[in-house]
């Protein structure tokens, strides 16, 4: 039986999978697998690749896969394909995160427009310029999150702002040895999960930085990093969902990638300050300290970058074809 005219050919399938693989993930773990076919793409979780020592490990896998899922949608929209998205479509297969089925021609123009920033987006752990992100841009980022069923809440008032900064510092100091050892193994592997040029400099602990920048390698002497003072008052926001569970984590991941691509288009970079979200008790404190009423999924540090790091390396993608429906 011949495929319809809107079916994906093999080069298109390969391009979509490659784009999806560029999505952000915890420690660049890329905990996903993609199955492609003429009729669409499936996103599968691959928890074997994810850090396992934190309380947030399972949530992080679904968040990362959600970011990849939005990138699949943007890539297919760029190819002018309309799609139907089913999240967690098989009750008996929790690792099947989403099935994206091509239904015809006519891609989502907003998602297609965001695709142009897929290759430019970076997780930026370097210092940002001190000027704040304009309120109008933050409103656009909030709208991007809401489009995917999440809420981006800016931390712009005291004492909530300082409380969350304090929680970030507390979580960094209280990290379990197993967490640090797992991360060190990943950072010193061949190849490293996050190369030195993507780690950013060691934060200068002289009171000049705002404490939101996460040093991923505090116990490692890695040549070439250097030290730097970071912005004294980092722009912080919390990405939240009304519910908490795999479907909400996938939604948060889609919202994250959508707002990050929107931010990239406005010259804004981001890194993540999720330290307190990796501990169940501190995660609850983030929610209450920020005077929020949803479930915090990500803490973002945003700003205008002084340095644009290279793209973090991606592992080769094996994307077997799945049978036609």
PLM feature spans:
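Acidic, surface-exposed loops and disordered segments
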Residues: 1-325
């Amino acid at each position: 039986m011949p495929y319809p005219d809107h079916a994906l050919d093999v080069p298109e399938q390969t391009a979509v999978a490659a784009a999806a693989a560029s999505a952000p993930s915890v420690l660049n773990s890329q905990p996903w697998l993609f199955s492609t076919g003429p009729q669409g793409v499936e996103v599968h979780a691959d928890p074997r690749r994810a850090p396992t020592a934190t309380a947030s490990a399972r949530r992080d896998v679904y968040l990362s896969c959600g970011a990849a899922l939005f990138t699949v949608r943007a890539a297919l929209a760029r190819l002018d394909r309309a799609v139907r998205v089913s999240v967690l479509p098989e009750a008996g297969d929790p690792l099947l995160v989403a099935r994206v089925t091509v239904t015809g021609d006519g891609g989502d123009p907003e998602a297609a427009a965001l695709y142009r920033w897929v290759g430019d987006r970076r997780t930026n752990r370097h210092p940002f310029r001190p000027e704040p992100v304009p309120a109008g841009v933050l409103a656009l980022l909030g709208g991007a999150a809401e489009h995917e069923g999440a809420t981006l809440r800016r931390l712009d008032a005291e004492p909530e702002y300082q409380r969350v900064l304090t929680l970030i510092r507390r979580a960094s100091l209280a990290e379990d040895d197993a967490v640090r050892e797992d991360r060190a193994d990943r950072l010193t592997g061949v190849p490293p999960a996050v190369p030195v040029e993507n780690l950013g400099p060691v934060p200068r602990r002289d009171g000049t930085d705002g404490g939101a920048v996460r040093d991923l390698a505090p116990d490692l002497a890695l040549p070439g990093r250097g030290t730097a003072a970071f912005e004294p008052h980092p722009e912080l926001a919390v990405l939240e969902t009304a519910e908490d569970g795999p479907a909400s984590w996938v939604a948060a991941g889609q919202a994250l990638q959508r707002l990050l691509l929107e931010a990239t288009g406005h010259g804004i970079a981001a890194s993540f300050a999720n330290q307190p979200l990796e501990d169940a008790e501190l995660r609850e404190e983030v929610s209450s300290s920020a005077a929020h009423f949803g479930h915090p999924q990500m803490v973002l540090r945003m700003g205008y970058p002084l340095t644009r790091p290279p793209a973090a390396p991606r592992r080769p993608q094996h994307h077997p074809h799945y049978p036609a429906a």
